[in-house]
Amino acid sequence: GGCVSCHTAKDGETFAGGRPIKTPFGTFYSPNITPDRETGIGGWSDKDFAKAMREGVRPDGAHYFPAFPYTTYTRMSHADALAIKSYLFSLPSAAQVNRDHDVRFPFSWRVVQAGWKLLFFDAGELAPDPAKSEEWNRGAYLVEALAHCGECHTPRNSFGALDRTMWLAGTI
């Protein structure tokens, strides 16, 4: 779990990316999230990092593909997003160039992601349920935001969005 499971290729440097993520739309390759200023996220500001995590937008303004779980990370607090950045920036840098995705047309166009977001992205921090206990709300926050459990354990629709009617129903 956590960042390392997607952002570390087999036999690769930790957090240096390159792990293939096969989808019906093609293969995505995880990026380098080490603090390397040239090939990783070392040049990112707090605003850049929070916008990537919570809005699915790169520092250059391009939209991320939803293979990156920003659709779930949007539910985390701004403070937790910056705590993750602080941790990642404390790790060793790896000068590993990011590999281009191998995604079929028209899904390869990042601009298409803007339309996808209009249909399937509900931005915003998870609000606690006042009818539930503090412990329950903390668990919900861990499952629905930080641990992003639904990203692997919820089936997706034909457009690659989580099928919320099947929340945590499994994908195998």
Task: Give, region by region, the residue ranges found by the protein language model.
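Electrostatic cytochrome c docking/interface patches
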Residues: G1, G115-E144
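Stable alpha-helical elements in mature extracytoplasmic
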Residues: G2, S45, F49, Y64, ...
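The canonical Cys-X-X-Cys-His
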Residues: G2-K10, F49, I84, G139-L142, ...
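Gly/Gly-Pro-rich "capping" loops immediately C-terminal to redox-active cysteine motifs
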Residues: K10-D46, Y64-H78, V103-V112, R156-I172
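C-terminal capping alpha-helices of c-type cytochrome domains
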Residues: S45-P59, T72-N98
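Inter-heme linker and motif-flanking segments adjacent to c-type heme-binding CXXCH motifs
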Residues: P59-A62, S90-R99, P130-W136, N157-L162
